[in-house]
């Protein structure tokens, strides 16, 4: 086991504080509409430029191990805030820095660290309750646009694209961000349920000019099995042919004479038919087939449920207004499933998302949720260079997370105003002793830090602006972009309540742990043995010289 370097008390805290300040100072320059860029060196390729707090935090590693521990603990604040709300990483880092700096001053002055932490926690609990009272619902397109615009660093085009995407696919719909091919940002919406499986034979194509299969008002047969024997399918094929409607077959696989028979029937015009493989694998395939059956109002023909393909009737088949099949994808539009069945399935998937432990499972469940609830929107980010593309894509993803958080828990006045108002409302809060009161004051002082930094980044005097904002009421605040005072909601400067709440809670949690730190332990740096061994022969030779 390697030897350890151990530091205690004030010596340990000073080292830790240096690390906290290095990381926080690098992150906080990005805050606000006039925040600056940070250039990150890469081991290969061009440097990347970002205004995203968590991207900056992730890049920072310090040489001194004790200082690095402080930096890594603040990095945890940014990561946790990012995981919880997808935004607010810079605010969280700034709050943590302020609490740690003020808290450690109090510890150095002889205050009890545990009581300080209790005071900070008490202030944060009260502040979160006040934030909930200040919060207003964010449901209309205008408010969503404003939140997206603020989070994308005042890029109105991004804000309006996100609002348009949410309008088209619903608040629960999946919105993905991709790198575009042009200079302009684009929004592409895929309505209905789409999955990554194309036609099993190009002979099914009935739109040769576009190379796709289109079926109008088709029946949909779903089978959780391989189909290779044509006899199994004959009864249902005859029933569909009599109805005059087209047929889509979704099965684990379709091969041999069964596929050949379908192709021949389709080419002769006896029955308009197409076949695709079921999406997913294993249990996920079963679940997705069940989703499709609920969406289309049919049943999955499954041997596990003692259902046989030969005995299936038209009542077992699903229906949709339209199906479009390309080489790689199948899209089912306008399924005729019952609304309440679809809603109960959506509720079930939401429950599974809450219980899921892995990010991969959550991602796949969210995809299924979106396909059932309305569709998928793809935001294609346009830029002139690859460096700009990466920076812009990170901003758009932040803005998307922020708007989702806003829809979930509502919005409060932005620009650091909400925390200043909350601090004003709980200014009379008291703890059980004077040390706890100091902890409360540390937290209240920290709540001004985001506003002060936004003002500082815009080139104005933080104390003057902060006092002016404190003298105002309600949503009255400072618009750093235009250098004007007024109602932040009217200015369109909004912050999601969830983002502000998460930033405050995670900052206080980690900062409280740092204030109560008394000892730090790390590995001693290893000595370079090669330099010692290289010097010994010279010493020996010197000795021989002396003997002569």
Swiss-Prot record:
ATP binds at residues 30-33, 51, 87-91, 415, 479-481, 495. GO terms for cellular component: cytoplasm. GO terms for molecular function: ATP binding; ATP-dependent protein folding chaperone; isomerase activity; unfolded protein binding. Its main location: cytoplasm. Its EC number is 5.6.1.7. The keyword Cell membrane does not apply. Disulfide bonds: none annotated. It is found in: Cytoplasm. One of its GO terms (biological process) is protein refolding. Residues 524-548 are annotated as: Disordered. Residues 539-548 have a biased composition (Gly residues). It is an enzyme of class 5 (isomerase). The keyword Transcription regulation does not apply. Keywords: ATP-binding, Chaperone, Cytoplasm, Isomerase, Nucleotide-binding. CDD domains: GroEL. It catalyses: ATP + H2O + a folded polypeptide = ADP + phosphate + an unfolded polypeptide. PROSITE patterns: CHAPERONINS_CPN60. Together with its co-chaperonin GroES, plays an essential role in assisting protein folding. The GroEL-GroES system forms a nano-cage that allows encapsulation of the non-native substrate proteins and provides a physical environment optimized to promote and accelerate protein folding. Belongs to the chaperonin (HSP60) family. Forms a cylinder of 14 subunits composed of two heptameric rings stacked back-to-back. Interacts with the co-chaperonin GroES. This is Chaperonin GroEL.
């Amino acid at each position: 086991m390697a030897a350890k370097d151990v530091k205690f008390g004030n010596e340990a805290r000073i080292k830790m504080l240096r690390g906290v300040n290095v990381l926080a100072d690098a992150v906080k320059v990005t805050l606000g509409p006039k925040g600056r860029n940070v250039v990150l060196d890469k081991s290969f390729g061009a440097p990347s430029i970002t205004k995203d707090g968590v991207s900056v935090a992730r890049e920072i590693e310090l040489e001194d191990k004790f200082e690095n521990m402080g930096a890594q603990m603040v990095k945890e604040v940014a990561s946790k805030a990012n995981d919880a709300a997808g935004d607010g990483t810079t605010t969280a880092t700034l709050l943590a820095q302020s609490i740690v700096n003020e808290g450690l001053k109090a510890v150095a002055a002889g205050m009890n660290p545990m009581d300080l932490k209790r005071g900070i926690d008490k202030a944060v609990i009260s502040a979160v309750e006040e934030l909930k009272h200040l919060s207003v619902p964010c449901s209309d397109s205008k408010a969503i646009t404003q939140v997206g615009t603020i989070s994308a660093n005042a890029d109105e085009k991004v804000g309006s694209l996100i609002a348009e995407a949410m309008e088209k696919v619903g608040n629960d719909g999946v919105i993905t961000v991709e790198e575009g091919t042009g200079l302009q940002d684009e929004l592409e919406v895929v309505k209905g349920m789409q999955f990554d499986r194309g036609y099993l034979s190009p002979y099914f194509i009935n739109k040769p000019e576009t190379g796709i299969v289109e079926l109008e008002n088709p029946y949909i047969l779903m089978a959780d099995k391989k189909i290779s024997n044509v006899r199994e399918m004959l009864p249902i094929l005859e029933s569909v042919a009599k109805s005059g409607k087209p047929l889509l077959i979704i099965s684990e696989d379709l091969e041999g004479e069964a596929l050949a028979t379908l192709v021949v029937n389709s080419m002769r015009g006896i029955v308009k038919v197409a076949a695709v493989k079921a999406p997913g694998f294993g249990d996920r395939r079963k679940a997705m087939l069940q989703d499709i059956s609920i969406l289309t109002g049919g049943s999955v023909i499954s041997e596990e449920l003692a259902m046989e393909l030969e005995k299936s009737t038209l009542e077992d088949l699903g229906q949709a207004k339209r199906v479009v099949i390309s080489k790689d994808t199948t899209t089912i539009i306008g399924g005729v499933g019952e609304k309440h069945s679809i809603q109960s399935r959506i509720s079930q998937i939401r429950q599974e998302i809450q219980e899921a432990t892995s990010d991969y499972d959550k991602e796949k469940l969210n995809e299924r949720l979106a396909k059932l609830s309305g569709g998928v929107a793809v935001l294609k980010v346009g830029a002139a260079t690859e460096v700009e593309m990466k920076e812009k894509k990170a901003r758009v993803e932040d803005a998307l997370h922020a708007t989702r958080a806003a829809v979930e828990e509502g919005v409060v006045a932005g620009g650091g105003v909400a925390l200043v108002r909350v601090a004003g409302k709980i200014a009379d809060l008291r703890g059980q002793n004077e040390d706890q009161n100091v902890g409360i004051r540390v937290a209240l002082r920290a709540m001004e830090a985001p506003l002060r930094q936004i003002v500082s980044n815009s080139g104005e005097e933080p104390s003057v602006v902060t006092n002016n904002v404190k003298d105002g009421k309600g949503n009255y605040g400072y618009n750093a972009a235009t250098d004007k005072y007024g109602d932040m909601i009217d200015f369109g400067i909004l912050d999601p309540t969830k983002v502000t709440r998460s930033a405050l809670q995670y900052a206080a949690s980690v900062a409280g742990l740092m204030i109560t730190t008394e000892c730090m332990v790390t590995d001693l740096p290893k000595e370079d043995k090669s330099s010692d061994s290289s010097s010994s022969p010279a010493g020996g030779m010197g000795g021989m010289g002396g003997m002569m």
